[in-house]
Amino acid sequence: MSATAARFPATDVRLSVEQVSYAYAANPLQAPLFTLEATSFQARPGEIVAILGPNASGKSTLLKLISGALAPLSGRVLLNGFPTHSLDPRARARRIAVVQQESRLLFPARVWEFVLQGRHPYSRGLAFESEEDVLIAKNALAQVGAVALNDRWLDQISGGEKQRVILARALAQQPLLLLLDEPTLHLDIGAQVDLLEALQRLARQNRYTVVVVTHELNLAGGYSDQVVLLHRGKSLRVGPPASVYQRELLEQVFQTALTVEMGGSGRPRVSILSDS
């Protein structure tokens, strides 16, 4: 498939990224430096899209454009037909949940307190959380298998457990679109697999549209429905993992000799070739 994704019927599309570009200038006398050029893809409810590429390929810029934190220089990002950057912060937070690489605590908190922060977009003034908010937060913890962590202090749980709790806070926002920036960073292999399997299950069951930024080839290929392959700010290919994972293309992007094999499930598996 080419760098422009195949189009679905309009009624099926939740997220539409249409020829989006972004650039910045270090100073007014310099020509703009493009960090992302003419990128397009569409995603439906229940789908996982992986934005894949090496460092400085434009992955985080694209995620910020999708979230509405940045306005595109050209093109548009539509969520259910509405430009994401034109939504006010409260409306945006009710529709889009963003899980950053690092979630830092400003003060000590128990897990349940942290997850309840996801209900902030629905709060009214200085009122305390409602019974409904508490139930939604508890359900979010249950969805990620973290109910047993409810009363634990956030700084006293493992990295894998913390990522599940951070995901629960995002789910408590009841979003249509879930955006995650390198969610498996610093996790061991087992925790990575657990997190991606949870995301896949949640996307299917709750009809979330999920966009994950990653540089992990096998995680992207193993769990996503679509891959957007970026290189130096350009979208080189968009499509199902099996169509994107071409050896020559991946070697060009990642500057590494590798092999690509298709497993029994039709999912690609990448191995790095040793120099020896």
Predicted regions and their residues:
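ABC ATPase nucleotide-binding domains
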Residues: 253-276
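The feature captures the beta-strand-to-loop junction immediately N-terminal to the Walker
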Residues: 52-54
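Conserved ABC transporter NBD signature motif
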Residues: 75-83, 92
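Conserved catalytic motifs of ABC-family nucleotide-binding domains
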Residues: 174
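Catalytic Walker B motif of ABC-type/P-loop ATPase nucleotide-binding domains
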Residues: 178-182
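Helix-to-loop junction immediately C-terminal to a conserved catalytic motif
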Residues: 67
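Conserved ABC ATPase signature
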Residues: 153-157, 161
